[in-house]
Structure formats: structure tokens, C-alpha cells
Amino acid sequence: MLKAYKFRLYPTEIQKAYFANCFGCVRFVYNRMLNDKIEHYKETRQMLKNTPAQYKHEFPFLKDVDSLALANAQQNLEKAYKNFFRDKSVGFPNFKAKHKSKASYTTNNQGGNIRIENGKIKLPKIGFVKMKQHRDFEGLIKSCTLSMNKSGNYFISILVEQEAPQWLPAEHKIGIDLGIADFAITTNDAGESVKYANPKCLYQSEKKGKKAQRALSRKQKGSKNRDKARLVLAKKYEKIANQRKHFLHKLSNKITDENQVIVIETLSSRNLMKNHKLAKAIGDVSWFEFSRQLAYKAEWKGRTLIKADRFYPSSQICSACG
């Protein structure tokens, strides 16, 4: 099985400059390849098969970064095309804007060019980078994704191939009803119902986030104070995201640990978000992310996850009747 482990990185200033260069080159190659594909199709009505290597002569700066990072940018573009042709509602591949797209790149482990030694991880082209490894893992490193968030912190997600652990069958079956007033109401086969409220810390953090947003809006554009206020706001939102992830991971772990069969309703967040009165509340509760976590954790642990039809009136039927 494949499992990802995410850790904080503490690069030097030289390494930060290299990462910034990688982020930019990956974005450049993705956009250039997408643009050339579009123009070629307009002229010939055929798909262009282009690769990052053919751009290195025209743009020599691409030779300064990890070639595997550029190859993965190509794979991401090809995947975006496949998703579009498979389901048009996904949308045509978009160009990546510098300040809106995620600053990240992915590289692969080839011949042991990625390894961990003495609290540092060795990466292609840049060497050893200091890493805070808060937990150990076993298995073969397949790839790594380097990223930088809005507050300027660096992270690495290490994809590892390892043997799947043997989980014992759980005792119960459970149904999950998602909501807004309460995040979820669960009922198991023993008739035990539990309400899980949205964590109060989120509301407190969101108030501080709104205050930081107002402070940013009052700063003069282009000033250093505005840059400082933007960093403060980014850190506030980062804290909110981390609190939400912690809540979702804790709850999804509890449910998949204790139950062999899990039934959850499939809600179309995209359609529900069209209701402007509910849009923010629905966005805050993160139903999709919770369902995603349940799905992969259920697969890891040998549980059965059943997604009930979204038109089934689960919210209108009591646990005794349904």
C-alpha cells in the first residue's frame, strides 16, 4: 500500500531560493505546455505531444532545477486532460497563476537519490534539508512533494510503499448523518446515537481571522505594513485549517476504528453551495474532506464504506425507523 507522511522543513536561504526557482519553473513548464497544446489544436485539430526536455534549449534556466519535477508537471497536465475528457464537468485545464496556484513540486526517488539521515532529507539537486520528523515510518520512498504555504512555511509529503497492517474486524455498524448545526450525528447498530458539534475553537479562530482581514483592508497597498498584515492573516487562516483537519482526522479515525460497516450520505456540496445563505456554513464544515478521509481510512483498515444515495431522506428518518 502507498501512504503519505507530511513533515515540516527548515531550509537555508540558499535552499529557499532553489525551491522558489523550482516552483516557478514547474508552473512555467505547465503553462507553456498547455498553451502550446491549445495553439497546436487550433491549427491542426490534433493533440500535441510535447515534453519538458524540448523547452530546455530555448529556456536554459530549466536546466537548473530537478528534471523529475518538470516531468511530474507534464504528468499533472496529462492527468488534467484525461479528467476533462472523462468528465466535461471537471472543466478544461487552467493556467496556473503565480499568486493563486499552490507553490509545490514533486520529485521521484530513483536509485536512492532521496533518503533520510540524521534529521535531514536528501533531495535531488539541492542535497540535505533539515526536517522535523515527528514520527518514524518503514517502507520504500517512492516520491516527495515539496510545498510552501501562504505564511512561508515549507513542508514535504513523502509517499511510501509499505505493507498493509492487519486490522481485526470491528464490532459495530454505523450510520452518519451530516449537518450544519451539528457536524454529524452517528447511530450504530446498538441504537446508540452521538452528536458531534463543530469545534468551538474554530469559531474563536474565525473571529480572529475576520479581525485580521479588516486590519489588512485598512493598510495601504504596496506598503510594508500591508505585507505584514497579509502574513498575519495567512497565519490565522492556516491555524483555522489545521484545527479543522485535526477535528476531521480525530473523528474519522474514531469511526473507522470502532465500526466494520460505515454508511454515509452523499451530499452534493457544489449544488448546496449555490444557496448563498448556506454557502459559508457548508464550506466551513468540510463534508467532502471528511468523506474522503473516511474512504481511504476504511480501505486501509478493511472496513466497508457505503455511500447512501443523496435523494434518500436520511435526515428525515429517525434511527429507529431508518
Predicted regions and their residues:
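Gly/serine-rich nucleotide phosphate-binding loop at the start of the catalytic core
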Residues: 1-72
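Well-ordered beta-strand positions in beta-sheet-rich domains
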Residues: 4-8, 128, 143, 173
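Generic detection of short hydrophobic beta-strand segments and adjacent strand-loop junctions
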Residues: 7-9, 129-133, 196
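Acidic carboxylate diad motif detector
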Residues: 50-149
